[in-house]
Amino acid sequence: MILISEIYFYNVTLGLLENIMREKILTALEKHAQGHIEKHRINIEVYLTNPVGIGEHSDIIETIEKELDEIARYQDQLDIIKKYFG
């Protein structure tokens, strides 16, 4: 026979596990976005400090704009996570 206290314990434990998993997923999403932001930021730094060293990118401005678009994409993800799930 299952006691009410056992059901309560099970529900509390399940709820805690769900919260832990939720936080781990959100943290992973945030770190993923932050990593991509840093990657694209560093690319821009390279283009700004040594534009002639990047032979396959003849239009530096356009190339930097593409990197900025990627930063904006991942920053939007971070903003949404914080606003709706944080």
Report the location of each language-model feature:
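Short, Lys/Arg-enriched N-terminal segments with co-localized hydrophobic residues
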Residues: I2-I20
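Extended, charge-rich alpha-helical interface modules
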Residues: R22-G86
